[in-house]
């Protein structure tokens, strides 16, 4: 499985979340299979978006696209960090 981990600060979580939810169709078409949203325990505006992806190449194209850059601006995202990951092992304890 392939994943993308995005860490970013947002101006306002509720405003960001509304735009995130509106983008569900373009996220799906870019290969997002599932996601988790997390936040720092001491700052609700520091968000971690962890998603399973069908293709890291498609994910890179999507996250670097002018359309998504504009969406991030509207959502109040500040300097996102993208980490592209390949699963090497999974287990349940």
List the predicted regions and their residue ranges:
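Glycine-rich beta-strand-turn "strand-cap" elements at beta-sheet edges
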Residues: 2, 30-48, 70-93
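Short, well-ordered beta-strand segments in beta-rich or mixed alpha/beta enzyme
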Residues: 2-9, 36-65
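A general marker of short, structured functional hotspots
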Residues: 4, 9, 16, 31, ...
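Short amphipathic alpha-helical segments
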Residues: 12-35, 67-70
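Compositionally biased, low-structure terminal segments
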Residues: 21, 63-64, 83
């Amino acid at each position: 499985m392939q994943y993308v981990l995005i860490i970013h600060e947002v101006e306002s979580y509720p405003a960001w979340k509304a735009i995130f939810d509106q983008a569900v169709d373009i996220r799906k078409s870019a290969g997002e299979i599932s996601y988790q949203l997390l936040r720092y325990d001491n700052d609700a505006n520091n968000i971690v978006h962890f998603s399973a992806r069908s293709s890291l190449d498609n994910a890179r194209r999507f996250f670097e696209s002018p359309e998504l850059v504009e969406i991030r601006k509207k959502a109040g995202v500040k300097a996102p960090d993208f980490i592209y990951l390949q699963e090497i092992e999974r287990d349940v304890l």
